[in-house]
Amino acid sequence: MKRILFFLLLGVCLGLKAADRDDSKYLAGAVPEVNGVVTFEKQFKVPGQTDDQIRNTLMTYVKESLVKNAIEGLRTRVISDGTTGEPICARIEEMMVFKNKPLYLDRTRFRSQTTISVENGKATITISQISYCTGEEAEGAKTETFKAEEWISDKASINKAGTKLYPRSAKYRRKTVDRVEQIFEEAMASFEPKAEKPVEKPKRRSVVVEE
């Protein structure tokens, strides 16, 4: 009886915790689409550097941060390194961890494509072709693959009122938005790690963001 009461109280506490979560950051518009395809994009300028210098710095970031820390295999590779002026392009597969506790690990394989083009001192980073491979942690379970369009898009993951995320895909949407933001921030920081935000002191900043 005591054990039943314990789990009932635990369920209530978890429910209250979920209800208190502020998901405003992840609601409508947080996961943009281009022609029906989930596509994240960030543009920024790097004054004082040539296109080749910008491209080389970003290629180093892709190799040393994204590829090096990803899962080794056919799903992680550099497709184009931009050495002849073409866009940098890399396929990345990495582990996206939701919870990691003793005797419990909740994670998925996060797959995406990062494309970077540089022109006239401006870099454009695009992350698209996103999918998730789940189920490999459960013994005897079959893995399933979901595309971002059917799992974390506004239509697939937000209720009709536009006020809440559906529980089944909420963690994927949150983690994806956070991971994409992290990649954008790291890429910009590779030019000047201690740069100040342009809104605060634009004259002392060498990387100018264009939203």
Positions of the model-derived regions?
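Sec-dependent N-terminal signal peptides
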Residues: R3-C13
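Ser/Thr-rich, low-complexity intrinsically disordered terminal regions
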Residues: A19-E211
